[in-house]
Amino acid sequence: VLSAADKNNVKGAWEKVGTHAGEYGAEALERMFLSFPTTKTYFPHFDLTHGSAQVKAHGQKVGAALTKAVGHLDDLPNALSDLSDLHAHKLRVDPVNFKLLSHCLLVTLSRHLPEQEFTPAVHASLDKFFSNVSTVLTSKYR
């Protein structure tokens, strides 16, 4: 559960992400594909080379979903219900992959947000947020 301080930290960090959400989403995906090559199996039809249009487009989707989630911190299950259905029933993504992407998102944000703004407290709040999003996205697997 996100505390009031966590919610403020997440919203504050995401304000700084702003229009870069899709770009950072794509960078995190590339990082995930390089660091955890088994994740590529869910994208057999994608060109996974650096800067590919398909990875950029999917990064935009990731960024948009996270932006939506930030706007609905008190109701993530309803806000992400459609994505939960998609990933559980149609795409059948192994739940561990959400943890891998979450890690790559944290690394990406740590690279782009200024050090004085990506504090340990903000890092912890974003980690909790990504964990909550992952939990919601895997909730319909059960």
Curated annotation (Swiss-Prot):
Transmembrane segments: none annotated. The modification N6-succinyllysine is found at residues 7, 11, 16, 40. Heme b binds at residue 87. The modification N6-acetyllysine is found at residue 16. Keywords: Acetylation, Heme, Iron, Metal-binding, Oxygen transport, Phosphoprotein, Transport. The keyword Phosphoprotein applies. The modification Phosphothreonine is found at residues 108, 135, 138. InterPro entries: Globin, Globin-like_sf, Globin/Proto, Hemoglobin_a-typ, Hemoglobin_oxygen_transport, Hemoglobin_pi. The modification Phosphoserine is found at residues 3, 35, 102, 125, 139. One of its GO terms (molecular function) is oxygen binding. O2 binds at residue 58. Pfam families: Globin. Residues 1-142 form the Globin domain. One of its GO terms (biological process) is hydrogen peroxide catabolic process. Red blood cells. GO terms for cellular component: blood microparticle; haptoglobin-hemoglobin complex; hemoglobin complex. Involved in oxygen transport from the lung to the various peripheral tissues. Heterotetramer of two alpha chains and two beta chains. This is Hemoglobin subunit alpha. The lineage of its organism: Eukaryota, Metazoa, Chordata, Craniata, Vertebrata.
